[in-house]
C-alpha cells in the first residue's frame, strides 16, 4: 500500500510538469472560394493558392518543432481554379495555454493567407462572382 501511495504521489507530481502536460491535437484549416474553369474564370482567387500562402506564413509564425503539416490538398479537377483547399496540422505545445497560442497563430496565418490571395487577385470583401462571394475565406477547426 505504501509503495502504491508513493507511485501515485509521483505520478500526480509529474503530471504537472511540461513533459507530462503536453497538448497535442490536430487542426484543420479549410479555405473556400468561387473556383471555376481556368479559361472562363482566369484571374479568380484560388483556395489552394491561399492554402499555400498560409503554409509559408506558418513557417514564420510557429516555433520549429511545434507543428507538423500532415495534409495539404485542394481542387477537384484538371484545368480548374481550386474552390477549396485544406491544410491539416498536428500542433504540440507544453501546456494548454501554449497550445491555444499556437491555434491563435494558425488562425491569424490562415486569415492573412486568404487576404494575401484576395489582394493579389484584386478582390475585395463584398465582391461577387455569379452571385457568390468572390473572396477566399478560411475556417480553422480542432480535431
Residue ranges, per PLM feature:
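Sec-dependent N-terminal signal peptides
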Residues: 4-13
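C-terminal segment of classical bacterial N-terminal signal peptides
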Residues: 14-19
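Midchain, well-structured core segments that form catalytic/ion-binding scaffolds
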Residues: 22-143
Amino acid at each position: 500500500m505504501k509503495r502504491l501511495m508513493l507511485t501515485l504521489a509521483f505520478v500526480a507530481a509529474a503530471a504537472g510538469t511540461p513533459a507530462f502536460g503536453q497538448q497535442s491535437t490536430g487542426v484543420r484549416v479549410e479555405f473556400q472560394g468561387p473556383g471555376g474553369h481556368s479559361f472562363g474564370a482566369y484571374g479568380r482567387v484560388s483556395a489552394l493558392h491561399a492554402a499555400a500562402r498560409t503554409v509559408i506564413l506558418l513557417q514564420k509564425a510557429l516555433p520549429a518543432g511545434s507543428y507538423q503539416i500532415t495534409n495539404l490538398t485542394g481542387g477537384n479537377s484538371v484545368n480548374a481554379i481550386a474552390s477549396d483547399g485544406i491544410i491539416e496540422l498536428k500542433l504540440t505545445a507544453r501546456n494548454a495555454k501554449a497550445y491555444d497560442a499556437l491555434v491563435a497563430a494558425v488562425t491569424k496565418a490562415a486569415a492573412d493567407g486568404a487576404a494575401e490571395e484576395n489582394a493579389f487577385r484584386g478582390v475585395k470583401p463584398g465582391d461577387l462572382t455569379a452571385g457568390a462571394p468572390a473572396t477566399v475565406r478560411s475556417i480553422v477547426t480542432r480535431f
